[in-house]
């Protein structure tokens, strides 16, 4: 049985959590898609100052999404970045989704900033970079929900995933794998988040467009299998 730390960096809000899902359940369900065995999961809430005390006691750690920017002056972010470096040093398989992707990149010295093209929302197609074509045969179709993006590839990693709207959409290296999109998101949850975002920093026109691009099938199972292949390689 693999022991996994799910490090949350935000909450979905009371209404979405009560009617659809919580981040806890979304990440746990996603991890089980490709695990092939039972998981011993422990939840941590980084945005509330709760981090694993000993990362080496876990086989894997996944760092989730957040409305925060990794460059913003929140007190909880520097300890999170420090923990990421420790986890990688301890050879714990360390994975990041969206904000988690950006946090791992920032912890390793990469720049993270807002995209000049604005928001990247709903279904997107992600191609495997030439150096990573052996990871999967076909592109991934996954849900995006971000404006911040990793601007450079940190030393010791390589970019394995890219899209027209996000050049550095995934990083891979010794004991780490990251992904800018949200493979844990379902169309139903994404619709609820988009509707709840009206009147906020996301233009309503962007939300209307995104809502038309949530049909079809998504590659969440393949993404989970990719994660577990990196975990097993690190064990």
Model-assigned labels for residue ranges:
Residues 64-130:
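Cysteine-nucleophile active-site neighborhood
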Residues 19-22, 56-58, 75-78, 109-112, ...:
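Short, glycine/charged-enriched secondary-structure capping and boundary segments
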């Amino acid at each position: 049985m693999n022991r996994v730390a799910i490090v949350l960096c935000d909450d979905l809000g009371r209404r979405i959590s009560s009617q659809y899902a919580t981040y806890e359940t979304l990440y746990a369900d996603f991890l089980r898609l490709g695990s092939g065995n039972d998981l011993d999961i422990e939840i941590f809430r980084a945005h509330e100052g709760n981090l694993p005390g000993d990362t080496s006691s876990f086989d894997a750690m996944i760092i989730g999404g957040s409305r925060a920017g990794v460059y913003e002056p929140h007190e909880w972010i520097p300890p999170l970045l420090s923990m990421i470096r420790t986890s990688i040093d301890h050879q714990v398989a360390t994975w990041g989704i969206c904000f988690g992707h950006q946090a791992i990149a920032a912890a390793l010295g990469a720049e993270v900033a807002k995209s000049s093209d604005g928001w990247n929302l709903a279904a997107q197609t992600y191609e495997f970079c030439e150096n990573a074509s052996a990871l999967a045969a076909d592109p991934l179709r996954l849900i995006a929900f971000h404006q911040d993006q990793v601007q450079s590839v940190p030393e010791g990693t390589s970019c394995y995933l890219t899209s027209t709207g996000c050049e550095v959409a995934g990083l891979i290296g010794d004991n780490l794998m990251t992904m800018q999109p949200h493979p844990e998101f379902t169309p139903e949850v994404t619709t609820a988040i988009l509707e709840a975002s009206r009147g906020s920093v996301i233009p309503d026109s962007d939300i209307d467009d995104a809502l038309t691009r949530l049909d079809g099938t998504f590659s969440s199972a393949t993404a989970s299998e990719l994660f577990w292949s990196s975990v097993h390689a690190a064990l």
